Amino acid sequence: MSSSYFIATRASKFLSYVLRHRPDSIGVTLDAQGWADVSELLTKAAAAGMALTLDELKQVVAENDKKRFVLNDDATRIRAAQGHSVDVDLQLPVKAPPPVLYHGTVGKSMADIRKQGLTPMNRHDVHLSPDRETATRVATRRGKPVILVIETYPLLRDGYQFRVSDNGVWLVPEVPAKYIKFPG
């Protein structure tokens, strides 16, 4: 692996931490929709030991395989696409999901999921993937993946609303266990 890969990975993790969970850790302010001023972010990131140029920031945003970050059109503001634990309203419109979505998890979480369903944990929403491959990639980070199938029509019928983030992750407040198809 090249040193630029490790720098990009480190920068991505830093940005995730700051833009999703702890903007206060470096003194950055997020607006109500989760946007941070790029100039302020770059200045305060450098003071915290994560010096990035605007071009490097744009590269991290463009090349992040999960498209975790979004820059506005003139690259003056940035936000995380989803996954916030801080209070933000991404103002994503309600949208009809595909008939089936997927959630990647690991075996050690299954007992709790069977009892409680999928809950947002420390986030605002449950994250669902549009395909099995993405769900597998998400789960593999934490161990041997277990893929759960969510048929969305029953959730829609019962009043659940879905939103889709800028990077294609489907968001829903919760998925009770009765809506989950568990593997054999």
UniProtKB/Swiss-Prot annotation:
Record keyword Secreted present: no
Source domain of life: Bacteria
Keyword annotations from UniProtKB, A to Z: NAD, Transferase
GO MF terms, alphabetically ordered: NAD+ poly-ADP-ribosyltransferase activity; tRNA 2'-phosphotransferase activity
SUPFAM superfamilies cross-referenced by the UniProt entry: ADP-ribosylation (SSF56399)
EC id: 2.7.1.-
Coiled coil: none
Gene Ontology biological process: tRNA splicing, via endonucleolytic cleavage and ligation
InterPro entries referenced in this protein's UniProt entry, alphabetically: Ptrans_KptA/Tpt1, RNA_2'-PTrans_C, RNA_2'-PTrans_KptA, RNA_2'-PTrans_N
Family assignment from sequence similarity: Belongs to the KptA/TPT1 family.
HAMAP family reported in the protein's UniProt record: KptA (MF_00299)
Biological role: Removes the 2'-phosphate from RNA via an intermediate in which the phosphate is ADP-ribosylated by NAD followed by a presumed transesterification to release the RNA and generate ADP-ribose 1''-2''-cyclic phosphate (APPR>P). May function as an ADP-ribosylase.
PANTHER family membership: PUTATIVE PHOSPHOTRANSFERASE, TRNA 2'-PHOSPHOTRANSFERASE 1
Name this polypeptide is given: Probable RNA 2'-phosphotransferase
Organism: Burkholderia pseudomallei (strain K96243)
Lineage: Bacteria, Pseudomonadati, Pseudomonadota, Betaproteobacteria, Burkholderiales
